């Protein structure tokens, strides 16, 4: 029997035993595992898979009562299938430790999307966003904020695309691709380091792309309708209150008009944060009340969760608890002022927002459901297009970033593409996403690949210079001079020289040299600041000769010369400083110095130093 078959047989036996006795112990699992699996994380993964099959794994054998809760299942076919799956996973785990291969393996389990699948996911994303917008519309102040932002950009000369991204109309048809231009992308940064695509990128930059944002006329109609309905809703709320049927109908009509408006992420997140902020304040006070009741007053948690909902701002609720006959009534009475203080903060929140506590929770619940729906759909779209990122990232290897870093940056661009994808344009998602992925990768290379960061605009200039330099090399058969490059690029010569200097890549001094790699680049570079051994030896000999000559003078004369010329000292000294040291006048020091120098000039003493002077 082969090793793999024997391994599968042992795993089958393990699973069958687990199904028969209703459990397994860690010791039994360990005995049946292959010897090459020793990593704790791998063992945990296998135990998790066994648990997923309905077999509990315990430290030791459980008692009989616990076993009665589990039903034994001895299906032979199921045991064989589970053993085969477990063996395959174990083999895979044992072999693969490379993160790239593990990533590729996980990526390969997701099927590619068809055009219909992309549209279906895009519609689910839009539906989730519509639900969020519909919930947000019921929160006071959100619609007014967006209307004020729209008024600001239209009256102060701002860009409509700073507020509005588009519209989400489920009934709109899909435009044929021929009727549309390719999806707009900020291509100024998408061409930073791709020599083969420089010309195309620069052509795109030269044609200053007109902003293809929302149509101002349609935006005026939509926001005008929302503003009119907002005014009607405000009057109905003021006249009848939020619980009146007419007011509810007007609010639903406002939400229907507000839902199709697709805001830019910054504005959308701002509205969501408004709702979350109110809910966070609400939760904070609810937690404080629960701690007072459950932790401090020893009220059973189940009792609190049953009685508190609906009584968040009812101060008589604590009176009833305090006057009750429960064990915790006395403690509640003692803590009643603190509980009422928290309830008053909740009441202030209701007054501030104009909503009841239950309404704030309901708005947040509907908003969270819509966000979760959109998030799940976006996750599906991203996972189904990870292969596209790999195919694009492969073209940018060996440019200063690791392959996994390129994949990561490309995935960030892919997520941006999912956020901005408009299936109604008629293009497949891959056509649209390619530009965003390439933009993210090239921008990251420009920002991160070099040890010394160079701005993106300078990277573009360097790439253009390199391309023109190669063209001129082919035309002339030699490297062009800076003057010739400046003439071709219509740039001053000094700027060309500056760009050429900036374009140089730094290299490590520890770069190995030679086949054996036993020496480094730094070993071959001259250190101009280092003194040669001969100079060092000469200086040391001069010091010794000077000390020997000075030893032939009197102690006073030698010290005066040492201080005046800074010999064996940090610095030299003036006549006045030396005079203070000896407590004599500066004239006397000058005389001592002159006498000492005359002695040193005598041939018997000066011959020791004259050889150094000749050198």
Swiss-Prot record:
Classification via InterPro entries: RNA_pol_sigma-70_dom, RNA_pol_sigma70, RNA_pol_sigma70_r1_2, RNA_pol_sigma70_r2, RNA_pol_sigma70_r3, RNA_pol_sigma70_r4, RNA_pol_sigma_70_non-ess, RNA_pol_sigma_70_r1_1
GO cellular component, one term: cytoplasm
Residue ranges for the DNA-binding region feature of this UniProt entry: 575-594
Subcellular location as annotated: Cytoplasm
Superkingdom assignment: Bacteria
Gene3D superfamilies tied to this protein: RNA Polymerase Primary Sigma Factor, Sigma-70 factor, region 1.1, Winged helix-like DNA-binding domain superfamily/Winged helix DNA-binding domain
Single GO molecular function: sigma factor activity
GO biological process: DNA-templated transcription initiation
Subunit-structure text: Interacts transiently with the RNA polymerase catalytic core.
Protein name: RNA polymerase sigma factor RpoD
Lineage, top ranks: Bacteria, Pseudomonadati, Pseudomonadota, Gammaproteobacteria, Pseudomonadales
């Amino acid at each position: 029997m082969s090793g793999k078959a024997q391994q599968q047989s042992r795993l089958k036996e393990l699973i069958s035993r687990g199904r028969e006795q209703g459990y397994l112990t860690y010791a039994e699992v360990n005995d049946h595992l292959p010897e090459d699996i020793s990593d704790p994380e791998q063992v945990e993964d296998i135990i998790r898979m066994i648990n997923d099959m309905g077999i509990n794994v315990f430290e030791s054998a459980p008692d009989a009562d616990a076993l009665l809760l589990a039903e034994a299942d001895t299906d032979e076919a199921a045991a064989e299938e589970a053993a085969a799956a477990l063996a395959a996973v174990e083999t895979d785990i044992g072999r693969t430790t490379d993160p790239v291969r593990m990533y590729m393996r996980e990526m390969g389990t997701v099927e590619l999307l068809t055009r219909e699948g992309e549209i279906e996911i895009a519609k689910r994303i839009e539906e989730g966003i519509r639900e969020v917008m519909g919930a947000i519309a019921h929160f006071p102040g959100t619609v007014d904020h967006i209307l004020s932002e729209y008024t600001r950009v239209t009256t102060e000369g701002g860009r409509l695309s700073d507020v509005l991204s588009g519209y989400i109309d489920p009934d709109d048809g899909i435009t044929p691709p021929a009727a549309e231009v390719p999806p707009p992308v900020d291509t100024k940064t998408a061409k930073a380091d791709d020599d083969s695509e420089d010309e195309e990128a620069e052509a795109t930059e030269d044609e200053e792309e007109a902003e293809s944002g929302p149509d101002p006329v349609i935006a005026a109609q939509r926001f005008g309708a929302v503003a009119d309905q907002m005014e009607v809703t405000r009057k109905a709320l003021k006249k009848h209150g939020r619980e009146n049927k007419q007011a509810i109908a007007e609010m639903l009509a406002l939400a229907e008009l507000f839902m199709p408006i697709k805001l830019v992420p910054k504005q959308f997140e701002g509205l969501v944060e408004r709702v979350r902020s109110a809910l966070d304040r609400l939760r904070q006070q609810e937690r404080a009340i629960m701690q007072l009741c459950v932790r401090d007053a020893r009220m059973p948690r189940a009792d609190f969760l049953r009685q508190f909902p609906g009584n968040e701002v009812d101060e008589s609720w604590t009176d009833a608890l305090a006057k009750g006959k429960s064990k915790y009534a006395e403690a509640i009475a003692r803590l009643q002022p603190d509980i009422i203080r928290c309830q008053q903060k909740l009441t202030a929140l209701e007054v501030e927002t104009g909503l009841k506590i239950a309404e704030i929770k309901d708005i947040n619940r509907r908003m969270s459901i819509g966000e979760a729906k959109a998030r799940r759909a976006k996750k599906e779209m991203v996972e189904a297009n990870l292969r596209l990122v790999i195919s694009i990232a492969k073209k940018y290897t060996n440019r200063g970033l690791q392959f996994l870093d390129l994949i990561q940056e490309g995935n960030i661009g892919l997520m941006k593409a999912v956020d901005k994808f408009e299936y109604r344009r008629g293009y497949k998602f891959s056509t649209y996403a390619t530009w965003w992925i390439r933009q993210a990768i090239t921008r990251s290379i420009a920002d991160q690949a070099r040890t010394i960061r160079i701005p993106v605009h300078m990277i573009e200039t360097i790439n253009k210079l390199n391309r023109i330099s190669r063209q001129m090399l082919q035309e002339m058969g030699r490297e062009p001079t800076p003057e010739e490059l400046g003439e071709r690029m219509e740039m001053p010569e000094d700027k060309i020289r500056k760009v050429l200097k900036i374009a140089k890549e730094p290299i490590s001094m520890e770069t190995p040299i030679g086949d054996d790699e036993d020496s480094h680049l730094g070993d071959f570079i001259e250190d101009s600041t280092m003194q040669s051994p001969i100079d060092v030896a000469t200086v040391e000999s001069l010091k010794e000769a000077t000390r020997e000559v000075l030893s032939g003078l009197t102690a006073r004369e030698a010290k005066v010369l040492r201080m005046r010329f800074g010999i064996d000292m940090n610095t030299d000294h003036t006549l006045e400083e030396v005079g203070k040291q000896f407590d004599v006048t500066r004239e006397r020091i000058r005389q001592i110095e002159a006498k000492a120098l005359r002695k040193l000039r005598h041939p018997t003493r000066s011959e020791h130093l004259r050889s150094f002077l000749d050198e």
